[in-house]
């Protein structure tokens, strides 16, 4: 679907299939700038600590403390309109840059919302967006996923005969997928790394995976666009969850306390 699509149509496809690929979410210049800046950050980023992170995979945590190149992506109007429909009140949970190196093994299939002990079935809790900065191919580690698995009954896990597809997508596009969709990074069988960014959003009443109020220094957070500040956690979940000494956290941030 193109980025000019109506948000209702994107949300309907996302909820029905568990995922949707939207083209034209970032222009070529934005992709080039983001790739170059993440290459800079990755120069001092270690590889993973375990098989899930990937022993030859680098992950840029605290993303919004280290680069400004995804500020606009995180607040893309179509993305926020879809999130308004699917999650209503939401926040950034786990934004991370991921570079899968040559020789990396396939990640186990998993659900991102399984970290929350909420009885099933439940409404959508997590929506991910995956932004490729290189071509994602079946050979270089493109994400694998099982279409429709977001709607599986409680307790069902992937079987050998479940149809696994590969997210072959190009830079400038973004794949939206529910946190209940079974998925995992693919094996990189090429001699070149593949780079992308995941922006994960979660319902506003859940604990964020990354504590952005500590990960992003206050002096950096003060300079961010207001909507991005809110998404990082400087916000209130209605009616008053998240206040600071009786005040809105964004007011405290602006005051320099």
Q: Residue spans of the language-model regions?
A:
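A conserved hydrophobic position in a structured secondary element of the catalytic/binding core
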Residues: 65, 75, 146, 177, ...
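Catalytic core of non-heme Fe(II) oxygenases with the double-stranded beta-helix
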Residues: 104-169, 203-217
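Aromatic-acidic/polar surface patches that form glycan- and anion
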Residues: 27, 71-72, 122, 165-168, ...
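Non-heme Fe(II)-dependent double-stranded beta-helix
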Residues: 1-17, 22-118
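A structural signal for short, well-ordered beta-strand segments
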Residues: 94-97, 129-131, 197-201
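Short hydrophobic/aromatic beta-strand or adjacent loop that forms the aromatic wall/cage
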Residues: 19, 126, 194-196
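Conserved double-stranded beta-helix
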Residues: 152-176, 180-181, 186-257
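A short, structural micro-pattern
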Residues: 91, 123-125, 191-193
């Amino acid at each position: 679907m193109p980025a000019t699509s109506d948000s209702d149509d994107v949300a309907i496809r996302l909820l029905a299939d568990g995922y949707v690929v939207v083209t034209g979410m970032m222009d070529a210049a934005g992709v080039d700038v983001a790739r170059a800046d993440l290459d800079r950050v990755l120069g001092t980023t270690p590889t993973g600590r375990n098989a899930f992170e990937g022993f030859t995979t680098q992950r840029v945590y605290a993303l919004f403390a280290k680069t400004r190149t995804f500020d606009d992506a995180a607040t893309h109007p179509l993305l926020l309109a879809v999130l308004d429909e699917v999650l209503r009140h939401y926040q950034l949970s786990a934004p991370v840059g991921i570079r899968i190196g040559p020789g990396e093994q396939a990640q186990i299939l998993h659900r991102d919302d399984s970290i929350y002990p909420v009885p099933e079935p439940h409404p959508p809790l997590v929506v991910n967006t995956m932004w490729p900065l290189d071509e994602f191919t079946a050979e270089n580690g493109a994400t694998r996923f099982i279409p429709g698995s977001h709607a599986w009954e409680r307790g069902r896990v992937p079987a050998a005969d479940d149809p696994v597809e590969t997210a072959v997508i190009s830079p400038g596009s973004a794949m939206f997928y529910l946190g209940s969709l079974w998925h995992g990074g693919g094996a990189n069988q090429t001699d070149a790394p593949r780079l992308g960014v995941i922006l994960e959003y979660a319902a506003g009443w859940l604990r964020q995976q990354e504590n952005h109020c500590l990960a992003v220094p206050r002096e950096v957070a003060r300079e961010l666009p207001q909507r991005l500040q809110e998404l990082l956690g400087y916000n209130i979940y209605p009616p008053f969850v998240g206040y600071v000494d009786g005040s809105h956290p964004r007011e405290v941030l602006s005051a320099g306390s």
